[in-house]
Amino acid sequence: MDRIVVKGSGPLSGQIPIAGAKNTCLKLMCAALLSDEPLTLTNVPRLSDVATLSELLESLGVQIGRLDDGQTLAFSANTLTSQLAHYDIVRKLRASFNVLGPLLGRTGQAVVSLPGGCAIGARAVDFHITGLEAMGAKIELKDGYVHAAGDLKGAEIEFPFPSVGATENVMCAAVRAKGTTVIKNAAREPDTKALADCLIAMGADIEGAGTETMIVRGVDRLHGATHRVIADRIEMGTYMCAPGIAGGEVECLGGTRALVASLCDKMEAAGLEITETDAGLKVRHPGGRLKAVDVATAPFPGFPTDLQAQFMAMMCFADGTSVLEETIFENRFMHAPELIRMGASIDVQGNTARVTGVDRLRGAPVMATDLRASVSLILAGLAADGETTVNRVYHLDRGYEHLVRKLRGVGANVERLSDG
C-alpha cells in the first residue's frame, strides 16, 4: 500500500497549476445521460473518482472517448442499454447517485444503489428523493436500491437545507420534465452553477443558477455541447494553505478569488497576504506567527466544509486558540486525533474543535481517514520537525491530481512510496 513521506522543508516558492474541479466534472458527466448527442468535457481532472464514474456510465451504455491524456472526455449516450446503477460501482463514489435525476428525466425510470464515498457521516439522500417525488416520481427503497419511475411534471420544491447533490439531481430531472420547476433554497455552489451553465449550453431553459431560487422550464430534448470544467476551488484552497503552514509565497494558477472568497477572508484575518493576479491567486506568508481565527463551515458562499481540515492544520501553528465549527457533516474531525499524534493541541466536543497553536509539530506516522483529512496531514508535515509518514493515501487519488509533483514544484520535501 502506498504512503507519502513528508519532511519539514522550509518556505515554499513557486506556482501550482489548479486542475479542473472534481465535483463539477462528476456532475457534468452525469448530465451526459440527458442527451442522445455527444457531450465533450475539457479540462477534466485525471482522478480515480472520474475513472469510477466513467465505469458506471459505460455500464449504462454510454460510450466514452478519451483525448489529451484524459483531460478531454467525449460522452455519447445515444443508446442507453440499462437504467441500473449497480451497488458494486456506486458504493465507491457518492457522486454516482447523481445519475438518478438524469436517468429518470430522460427514460422515466431508474434503479440506483444508495451511495458510498468518504466515510464522513450519514449524508442521507432524503432531499433527492422528496424533490423527485414532488415532480411525480414514484419511488421505492428496496434492498439498498432506489427504484424510481414516472413521467415528471414541473413542481415547486423548497429544500430544508441547500443540498448540493439534491439541487443538482432535481435540476437535471427538471430540464426534461413537463412544465416549470421552481427550486427554492437551492445550493449556490460554483459547481451547481457550472452544471446549470453546461445544461444551458445543451439547450436547457434555466434561470437563477447560483442564487437561492432556480426556475427550470422543461424541454423536449437536449443537444450536444462542448464544455470546460471550471477550476477546482477545493484544490486551490488546499494549496493556498501550504504557505500558510510552511511559509513562503505560492501562486495558484487558474482560479479566482470569487471561488474561494470565504477562505481568503479568513486567511487575511490570520495575517496572510493574498493578491489576485492575471493568472490566479498569490498567497504570501509575511513571517512570524499567524493569528488564530474562528471558522464555521457553511454552504456557499460560506466557508467550505471541504477546506475545514486544511484550515485546522494551519491553525495548529497560529498564535492563540481558534474555534472550528462543522455545521455540514457529522464525524468530520477524524483528522484531529492524527494531528494530535504530531503534537497539536486540539479539543473536539461534538461538532466543535478548539485548536490552540503550538510552537512546533513533530513528525509521526499517521493514518488518512478520508480525502481532505489525508491532505491536511501532508500539509501539517510540511512544517513539522522530522519525518511524517501518511498512510492510506489512496484517498488522495480521488481528489488531487499530481499532488506530490505539485508540492515538490514549490520546494516541498515530499515523496510517495510503495510497498510494491
UniProtKB/Swiss-Prot annotation:
It comes from Jannaschia sp. (strain CCS1). Keywords: Cell cycle, Cell division, Cell shape, Cell wall biogenesis/degradation, Cytoplasm, Peptidoglycan synthesis, Pyruvate, Transferase. Cell wall formation. Adds enolpyruvyl to UDP-N-acetylglucosamine. Belongs to the EPSP synthase family. MurA subfamily. Pfam families: EPSP_synthase. GO terms for molecular function: UDP-N-acetylglucosamine 1-carboxyvinyltransferase activity. The gene is murA. HAMAP family: MurA. It catalyses: phosphoenolpyruvate + UDP-N-acetyl-alpha-D-glucosamine = UDP-N-acetyl-3-O-(1-carboxyvinyl)-alpha-D-glucosamine + phosphate. The active site is at C118 (proton donor). UDP-N-acetyl-alpha-D-glucosamine binds at R94, D306, I328. It is found in: Cytoplasm. The modification 2-(S-cysteinyl)pyruvic acid O-phosphothioketal is found at C118. Its EC number is 2.5.1.7. This is UDP-N-acetylglucosamine 1-carboxyvinyltransferase. InterPro entries: Enolpyruvate_Tfrase_dom (IPR001986), Enolpyruvate_Tfrase_sf (IPR036968), MurA_subfamily (IPR050068), RNA3'P_cycl/enolpyr_Trfase_a/b (IPR013792), UDP_GlcNAc_COvinyl_MurA (IPR005750).
